């Protein structure tokens, strides 16, 4: 509440400005109330201008609608004892509020005159009305937005050449608020015009509309396979296996099995506590005894494609058949008699064998849609270019390997960027270090689950693009093609051949695979975490109480899963392979003095050996030469090796012949499998770096021996130039050199390994962005140091 100027003078205080008056209250926090309205009942005093409805949020928010707040409510209030009976009882209007802001004395809504006072704060108006300040703020905000909209007017025709109408201003205002100028960077957009509710999950736009489907959790899921052989085989996956062939007569057992040892009776629980459960699973199963169903993310074909295939290859939908009192269910596309002719065209099979063949073909027709989707995954994700792109994206997601080295060198965190439909977004709120905060089984489960969700999100994005881009003409062309090939498809012997034929027609050979290099999108860790939370919420599993992961409910083997979950099984197996192939679980050996370079090391084919300075000596030398030289040609052009130039060339560095997409071949264990020469990124010739080092060494030697002045080491303050003896009468001679060994500075080399330059904990690695592989004593640059007989560190001569 605000205090009047007279009240301030009565207490011996100076009148305050309108903006400050709202913060000045009595000792009890409010103005005194008349005795006839508020008797002394022991309750806190209420403000005089507050009615029974004053608990609304508008009373404290400082924001009101354009009509000035609650005018209708205030105008109908009864006259208070302190309300004058003169013209001051007139209600507040926008015009009176404007007059107050200009310095005129006008009555407020409550009926008290505002007293003008020429205080040293420059306050021109004082008011007791709590709504006047809010109304003024509202008008100022609306005027600011409208002014920005008019300045940003780029309508056709221009706004200044057309009549200034309400419709024209409204259109420009909507354009200014909801369609900002794309030339303005997103990080510089005015925050006052951003209306997305904080932390709200946006509705999926331009994406697959079927998100997930509820199904019973099989007892053979990954959460019930702790300590089993099938889980160990999945964790040690070394090859990207093909989709198995569908054989008739294979039995599927999705029960708990004999491989695991439960510690309680089975009862009706879907998630059984086991002896080999991790601490996370023990706690989750104890709190998740009620879980029976899970919301598995959808991995089907686009709805338009699936509907067309069902109508052409199986039978039409019932609602599309003309309805009537005697109308029967739609017939299959091939009745039993015609199907018998397709299965046995020569008529040589016995009746029993023919019936069996028809039954088998019918079962194949039922399972073909599920097997067909998995077949499509195999044809897309097993492409070498798709594997390479997926590993690059996952390195960005986990801030691993070459992405971490770029951050150390160029001070750019690429893990914060995400792409979608050709648009790049920067998310500075992303946390890319979550996977590095865990270890052991917790880290493995988290990384595998993140890769599994990444594959699901990638497939749903591709199917969403296909669903939106496909036209009715294309659907009709598909319908004609499958109608023409329907008999030949049914004549195939195995479901594997049938599914392959259908996928080949749908994908037009490798047409979809040709489009997949645009996918997957770069995905950051916050997107994966939000997707994980979304799936768990849809499954009614609070992660704060039961810390399950979506991949915990997926079986590990096709033989232990019903056909409805085969697509989930395939993606989970792919996630295990990509986890091992990308080296995301690599940990350095624990030593007393950790190597700072281990923060950015990765053993996978994308990084080692060509992108890792630990293995690539020319790359290591080039890292040390960044920002240390500048070459100027005769025509005035200059060349300088900057971090940005190096980072761009480093991202493009890739050797296809040393890349093994379908097998886990890490360089430290299989050096013989890599044959390409190790080179730098920008300076391909090592002679250039050698010449630069010689020039730099000569320059430093010249300045140290013949230059004037005293040169000190910038790190230790140690004097580098020889100092003459200043005693009187002493003969001038060269000063004794400081105790240098084969290092650039410091005492003699100790037999113990050198300690880390900086703390190497994960938190320090995230906060201190030091340049990778660039110790201060090995840096080239304007800092001058005296060197030993060996002008350069030993690392360069190896």
UniProtKB/Swiss-Prot annotation:
Residues 309-376 are annotated as: Binding to host EIF4G. Residues 379-497 form the RRM domain. Keywords: Chaperone, Eukaryotic host gene expression shutoff by virus, Eukaryotic host translation shutoff by virus, Host cytoplasm, Host gene expression shutoff by virus, Host-virus interaction, Inhibition of eukaryotic host translation factors by virus, Late protein, Methylation, Phosphoprotein, RNA-binding, Translational shunt, Transport. InterPro entries: L4. Residues 1-123, 740-798 are annotated as: Disordered. The keyword Aminoacyl-tRNA synthetase does not apply. GO terms for biological process: intracellular transport of viral protein in host cell; symbiont-mediated suppression of host gene expression; symbiont-mediated suppression of host translation initiation; viral translational shunt. Protein that inhibits host translation while promoting late viral translation by ribosome shunting. Blocks host cap-dependent translation by binding to eIF4G, displacing MKNK1 from cap initiation complexes and preventing EIF4E phosphorylation. Binds to the tripartite leader sequence of viral late mRNAs and recruits host eIF4G, PABPC1/poly-A binding protein and 40S ribosomes subunits on viral mRNAs, allowing ribosome shunting and efficient translation of late viral mRNAs even though conventional translation via ribosome scanning from the cap has been shut off in the host cell. HAMAP family: ADV_SHUT (MF_04060). This is Shutoff protein.
